[in-house]
């Protein structure tokens, strides 16, 4: 599946209006989760998200305790905020190359968004990640999403269509870093100089940690 020319835990409600119309004058920030309170807020968001997925019969990781991962001060986690409210959390890392990908990349691990949010949140993360990768001289962003069934089956097919509309390429499926079957995603890095008017990156140039298999 290829993307047209120019969210991640699993299902999101489709966006019905444009960014500008839905969030006029909104100020977003991506920053490292540095305090115990921020890390606990991220863990609670993950728990809410996993509960939301479970109630809808959608997959959650079978092996890893993801909330505990976000509570761990040794995890280099980040959050997307709007006026101080945490909208999403993730674990970005510099990766020398996943088993299914060639070459270095920015790996977006453990992406979780607030339940019942529009696709705009995933789109913000997509824009931010592609710009961050470019600023770190990395050619690609890679991510994985759980996919227990064929990629052509719903609801994963609808999610992948929305992600390809945002610029992601689907690179097939296979075992993920924790052994679950996943869909493999790639995004081309792209400098976006005007993005700072929408998203402030308050991460001190985001000195990405090297890949650590314990924090997938």
Question: Where would I find each of the regions flagged by the language model?
Answer:
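Terminal substrate-recognition subdomain of acyl/acetyltransferases
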Residues: 1-35, 82-85, 135, 142-216
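Hydrophobic alpha-helical core bundles mediating ligand binding, dimerization, or RNAP-core interactions
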Residues: 42-50
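Active-site rim helix/loop that mediates acceptor-substrate recognition in acyltransferases
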Residues: 50-82
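Short, high-confidence coil segments that cap the C-terminus of an alpha-helix
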Residues: 75, 135-138
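Conserved beta-strand in the GNAT
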Residues: 79, 85-96, 107
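Short coil/turn motifs at secondary-structure junctions
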Residues: 95-97, 116, 148-150
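Conserved acetyl-CoA binding element of GNAT-fold acetyltransferases
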Residues: 100-115, 144
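Conserved acetyl-CoA-binding loop-helix of GNAT-fold acetyltransferases
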Residues: 117-134
């Amino acid at each position: 599946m290829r993307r047209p020319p120019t969210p991640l835990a699993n299902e999101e409600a489709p966006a019905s209006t444009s960014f500008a119309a839905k969030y006029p004058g909104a100020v977003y920030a991506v920053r490292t989760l540095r305090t115990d309170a921020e890390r606990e807020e991220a863990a609670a968001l993950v728990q809410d998200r996993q509960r939301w997925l479970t109630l809808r019969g959608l997959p959650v990781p079978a092996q890893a305790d993801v909330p505990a991962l976000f509570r761990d001060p040794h995890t280099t986690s980040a959050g997307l905020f709007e006026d101080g409210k945490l909208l999403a959390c993730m674990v970005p890392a510099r990766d020398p190359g996943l088993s299914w990908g060639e070459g270095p990349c920015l790996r977006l691990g453990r992406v979780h968004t607030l339940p019942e949010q529009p696709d705009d949140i995933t789109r913000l993360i997509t824009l931010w990640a592609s710009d961050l990768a470019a600023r770190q001289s990395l050619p690609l962003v890679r991510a994985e999403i759980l996919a227990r069934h064929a990629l052509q089956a719903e609801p994963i097919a609808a999610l992948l269509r929305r992600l390809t509309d945002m610029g992601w390429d689907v690179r097939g499926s296979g075992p993920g870093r924790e052994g679950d079957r996943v869909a493999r995603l790639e995004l081309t890095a792209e400098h976006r100089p005007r993005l700072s008017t929408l998203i402030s990156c308050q991460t001190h140039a985001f000195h990405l940690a090297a890949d650590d298999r314990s924090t997938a």
